[in-house]
Curated annotation (Swiss-Prot):
PROSITE patterns: ARGE_DAPE_CPG2_2. This is Beta-Ala-His dipeptidase. Found in serum and adult nervous central system. Absent in serum from patients with homocarnosinosis. Keywords: Carboxypeptidase, Glycoprotein, Hydrolase, Metal-binding, Metalloprotease, Phosphoprotein, Protease, Secreted, Signal, Zinc.
């Protein structure tokens, strides 16, 4: 049998079986004939969808390295996306975001944010999709097995920078829209897009734009969808209802600006590095428990219902450990690992600026060093309170050393955690769409990382926000050999199409 016909038959069978099963659900079913046509279209055109992803991955839209060449690529990427949406019939505005001021005093233009609209039927609900088209730095010499900017398919895996974070999911949503358009079918819901090009650099100036547009562009929005994270397994889909926040700290210890010769001064100084190592060592113990007094005060007590949520999640610990390439985790059970990723704060030490870190030997005593660490915050933790607790703790530890050096603590980043109500109607619609496409219940997960835009939308726009990831846990976003599986990309396109139909049932 032709492989395409086989995929079509499998999709049709899954749809028919699941539509028969749907009598147990409270919401009406989407039109089965339309769903079948859309799925067939997506299967038949999947090679075209992969080709478009290849074209988008080829644009080196790196927002992290503030150099003119990459900034030009970012502008090109946003122009390509705007043109794609216009060809679908969307009303598109590319909003000028002004300049980005760099630490060295220079400035670079910020790529425009795309605000696009498809449909304005007052009888339909309006769903707004957020995505970003900038990527982390990538270089073949960093350990990539393929050119990071040439999408390469190996055993069903599509390797390339941005394939899963976030160009693939953005295109999956666009592909779902294009399927309805190609079949000359009305979109089940009104759709809006907000697409940026600076997420990897901290979404520069985006919050100001969202605030400015809350009573215009966002005024008719009923629901917001983000697809910018991963499943917790390789094969089972998930819905994300919470993320951790992030407080990033720097602690500077200084004797003088110049380094010292260890033969001349070793043994007669309060060495800044020794002070700093003691400070960093006071933050967290060998079991991962944070030693800062008061840090756990706002962490909500664990409930039986929450424990049952963790038990229901599919997580193969051996698979997870192998895909992570670590010998052992701090905890031995699925439930403990999930809780310490999602519902408890964590503290990570990232590096020391000013220390000798090159090959060879260099017998200097650094005159000034800066330690860098961050705390991932969980819901109900307060960023300002954490800043005070950390500063107070480090000052207390430093005072006991009786050092003549100077210590300065600063929090350079303070991003809030986010959590949503999983009984919200949008979440129930997403669950039904996942059942239709994948034939299984989704894992209801949180994300241990930080996605500031979710909290931003929740606080400014005051609408339901859901994260619907498409990529597998081993996609390697931000790392070498980032990929998205062809299966995830294509089935994710179907998921968004089914989601449109489910959301239509809410109005």
């Amino acid at each position: 049998m032709d492989p395409k016909l086989g995929r079509m038959a499998a999709s049709l069978l899954a749809v028919l079986l699941l539509l028969l099963e749907r009598g147990m659900f409270s919401s009406p079913s989407p039109p089965p004939a339309l769903l079948e046509k859309v799925f067939q279209y997506i299967d038949l055109h999947q090679d075209e969808f992969v080709q478009t992803l290849k074209e988008w991955v080829a644009i080196e839209s790196d927002s992290v390295q503030p150099v003119p060449r990459f900034r030009q690529e970012l502008f090109r990427m946003m122009a390509v996306a705007a043109d794609t949406l216009q060809r679908l019939g969307a009303r598109v505005a590319s909003v000028d975001m002004g300049p980005q001021q760099l630490p060295d005093g220079q400035s670079l233009p910020i790529p425009p944010v795309i605000l696009a609209e498809l449909g304005s039927d007052p009888t339909k609900g309006t769903v707004c999709f957020y995505g970003h088209l900038d990527v982390q730095p990538a270089d073949r010499g960093d350990g990539w097995l393929t050119d990071p900017y040439v999408l390469t398919e190996v055993d069903g895996k599509l390797y390339g920078r941005g394939a899963t974070d976030n160009k693939g999911p953005v295109l999956a949503w666009i592909n779902a829209v294009s399927a309805f358009r190609a079949l000359e079918q009305d979109l089940p819901v009104n759709i809006k897009f907000i697409i940026e090009g600076m997420e990897e650099a901290g979404s520069v100036a985006l919050e100001e734009l969202v605030e400015k547009e809350k009573d215009r562009f966002f005024s008719g929005v009923d629901y917001i969808v983000i697809s910018d994270n991963l499943w917790i397994s390789q094969r089972k889909p998930a819905i994300t209802y919470g993320t951790r926040g992030n407080s990033y700290f720097m602690v500077e210890v200084k004797c003088r600006d110049q380094d010292f010769h260890s033969g001349t001064f070793g043994g007669i100084l309060h060495e800044p590095m020794a002070d700093l190592v003691a400070l960093l060592g006071s933050l967290v113990d060998s079991s991962g428990h944070i030693l800062v007094p008061g840090i756990y005060d706002e962490v909500v007590p664990l409930t039986e219902e929450e424990i049952n949520t963790y038990k229901a999640i599919h997580l193969d610990l051996e698979e997870y450990r192998n895909s992570s390439r670590v010998e052992k985790f701090l905890f031995d059970t699925k439930e403990e690992i999930l809780m310490h990723l999602w519902r408890y704060p964590s503290l990570s030490i990232h590096g020391i600026e000013g220390a000798f870190d090159e090959p060879g030997t260099k017998t200097v005593i650094p005159g000034r060093v800066i330690g860098k660490f961050s705390i991932r915050l969980v819901p109900h933790m307060n960023v300002s309170a954490v800043e005070k607790q950390v500063t107070r703790h480090l000052e207390d530890v430093f005072s006991k050393r009786n050092s003549s050096n100077k210590m300065v603590v600063s929090m350079t980043l303070g991003l809030h955690p986010w959590i949503a109500n999983i009984d919200d109607t949008q979440y129930l619609a997403a669950k039904r769409a996942i059942r239709t496409v994948f034939g299984t219940e989704p894992d209801m997960i949180r994300d241990g990382s930080t996605i500031p835009i979710a909290k931003m939308f929740q606080e400014i726009v005051h609408k339901s926000v859901v994260l619907i990831p498409l990529g597998a846990v081993d996609d390697g976003e931000h790392s070498q050999n980032e990929k998205i599986n062809r299966w995830n990309y294509i089935e994710g396109t179907k998921l968004f199409a089914a989601f449109f139909l489910e959301m239509a049932q809410l109005h």
